[in-house]
Each structure stands twice: as structure tokens, then as C-alpha cells.
Amino acid sequence: MVREALDSDFDLRALLLREGVEPAFALPAGVPVFVLSDRVFAAVSETKTPQGVAAVLSRRIRPLSGSRFVALDAVQDPGNVGTIIRTADAAGFDGVLLGPECADLFSSKVLRSTMGSIFRLSFAFPEDLSADLRTLRSRGFSVLSSQLDGEPFYSREEIPAPFVLIVGNEGNGISAPVKAEATHRFRLPMRGGAESLNAAVAAGIMMYDLMKHPDQSRCTPHTSPRRSSVPTVLPHT
């Protein structure tokens, strides 16, 4: 993940190395490098088995832009938030809206779970997610809600971009004010005995299916950035 940070436009303030560790990348010029003892490195790292390389970065994000977004409505598990961000990046989405009560994007577990995708996507942090969805609707976005009483997801007509997919809270689903902004309401079929899916799993299924058609997919292997050129920037409140 440190290598991903080096390749990004984030501001790198310092590199931390554990004694005896040789990084598998060239050290950037002009960046302070601190070599720490095992004890000190373990104290600054929150992982049980740190790899011995860490980076100090400025909290810098790309303002929301593009035409394919996922919106998180009080998704509280850090692993789910990070996994959804990683999957959105892999599927070819442009950005993520994190509403109130979501896990902190900059917590260590969320950061690790993104596996570097935080450096490639754009983000917004609305205080009122329903208001931002209303703004997106006014700009021509379809707003997709996943809910138990929705229409079968795989029976839908294709939905071209721009669109935003809402992912709800792990226990309570999508809140009523956010759900009210949906232009399309879907449910994933459950053919076995399970009552529901993990939020990140359900989001991943829907994101990949929304991007499966050639006219919707923008994914070009081994190129970066892969983002849409259509600007859609919401004010950060």
C-alpha cells in the first residue's frame, strides 16, 4: 500500500522503516526517512504483523467527480467501508459518498481494507446524504436503492450512467430519507436459506453487474487513471 501511495498525488511527508528492512521500491528523493527499532515501529503500527514499511501522508482526497458513484448510508463496519471502496475501484466506479455515521475513511482498518483504492477514487462527505442525492437527481443521475421490497435486480432494464448506487447500514438498511430519493428500487434474489447478504458482498455484486456491459464499462487494464471525464462536483459541507 505504501507503493500505491508513492504513485498517487497524495503528499508524502515521511517514510518509516523498521531496522533491517529494505523496501522493495526506490526511496523518493527529498522525503525524510526514519529508521525505527522493532519496539518503536510496533508502537506506531496498529497491525499485529507489520511489514516494516510505513508512510506519513497528508489527508488529501480527490473531490467527487465522474458519473458512477456508490453512496454509503451509515455503513459502520470499517472492513465493509474499505472493501466497498476497493470493489468500486475494481469495478470502474468514479467515486464514493460517505454519509454521516459511516466508519472514518482515514481509520487504519478502512485504509488497509481499501488496499490502495483510496488513492484512485474521488470522495464526498455530505452532512445530509439525502440532500446530495437530490442534487445528483437534478443533474440527471439515476439513484439506485437496494431494499427487500424492491424489484428483482436481474430483471431490470439497463441503466446507463450517470447513476449512484446506495448501500445501507448493516443492521437497518437504507434510512427512510435516503430511500425516498431513489429513482429505482431493487432487491437481490435469495434462492437459498440466507435472509440477507453482507453489505460489502451485496454492493460488490450490484456494482459489477451494473458495469458488465461494454457500453457502460470504462475499464482498460493496466492504465491509470481510469476515471470518467464527466465532472460532477458537490460542495463539501
Where are each of the predicted segments found?
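Acidic/glycine-rich phosphate/pyrophosphate-binding loops and surrounding catalytic core
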Residues: 46-64, 102
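RNA substrate-binding interface of SAM-dependent RNA methyltransferases
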Residues: 7, 61-150
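Active-site/ligand-binding-proximal alpha/beta "capping" segment
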Residues: 144-194, 198
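N-terminal positively charged helical leader segments and presequences
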Residues: 1-45, 219-237
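Short, polar loop motifs at secondary-structure junctions
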Residues: 1, 18-23, 59, 148-150, ...
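Short loop/helix-cap segments at secondary-structure boundaries that form the rim of catalytic
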Residues: 23-30, 62-65, 177-180
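Structured adenosyl-cofactor binding patch, chiefly the S-adenosyl-L-methionine
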Residues: 55, 90, 105-118, 176-219, ...
